[in-house]
């Protein structure tokens, strides 16, 4: 789902003059998995297909829960390991309770908490409460996921998923080695002066026909049973300056996350020239159109959505549920020490409303033109964050 969504979100960015992109496939995956627990019929089938899931929602919930439970918590950066925090919450109108089976499924998979609020009388108060929850879960990197007007008296349920990641490199860069250099913008858009991190250390680099891949491992806590770095930032760099979209199409055709895993570098090699820019990106907006583009349609249609397993029956005049919007926020900063990144996804429901050839030694890796990046958990292959850098000097936000 990560690459398919990236393509759709990129199309939307281009239409508004954007370029850079960061989002969290895992956060979106978690929120949509919660929704599947209350879906039936075509609504459920479309969600399962988009998530690349098994044929049953129970199997999906089990798989998703295993990924989330594998994320280490706590203040890992204090002990040299990553700090990873994932949180999930449900807010329902106090006049209609969440069905026990739906609540229990969300709690079992994601330790989701459920809260009753008064959407009818105090929608703004409910919005502020949810925003405060997201801000706390993301260490204030995302302080407002729900803009004014996004929660109304028609709102019946809000599902939120947030993730925070902070880790240091296994081999940090020296700040004194960071220097300005030219970064070439897509489509002949000229050059910009960007801050490039540099290193003469051996790196995890693999060279393929038309592109190279860099893996930069993060520090992990010492363990008798797990000695290899668990998290890494992977950079897919096309050989051609304007080759980002061609590479993205090739990755998607190759199976998305499968392509990513098959092309992950396995060993360090000597490098010649090595440069990668520092970057700081953010995203904030609706991903409804992007989700519709990957086949999730019925859940947004007031006449077709079947979310009958979400809420208890209300008054006879209460209309059926549908999803009015899915909002997503993400922010990432990559620098000499490591990476800090966070994301949140909010679902608002309303009533009707392959192995590489050995890389030559030494090999150059100069990321001076647009590239794709992924923060991955290596044992499961889970993609926590994904995106691409078109201009590292522009902290673009949708």
Swiss-Prot record:
GO terms for MF: serine-type endopeptidase inhibitor activity
InterPro entries assigned to the protein according to its UniProt record, in alphabetical order: Serpin_dom (IPR023796), Serpin_fam (IPR000215), Serpin_sf (IPR036186), Serpin_sf_1 (IPR042178), Serpin_sf_2 (IPR042185)
Record's GO cellular component terms: extracellular space
Site (Reactive bond) residue list: 352-353
Annotated stretches, region: RCL: 338-362
Keywords in alphabetical order: Protease inhibitor, Serine protease inhibitor
Keyword Transferase appears in the UniProt entry: no
Entry's free-text remark on domains: The reactive center loop (RCL) extends out from the body of the protein and directs binding to the target protease. The protease cleaves the serpin at the reactive site within the RCL, establishing a covalent linkage between the carboxyl group of the serpin reactive site and the serine hydroxyl of the protease. The resulting inactive serpin-protease complex is highly stable.
Protein name per its UniProtKB record: Serpin-Z6B
Organism: Oryza sativa subsp. japonica
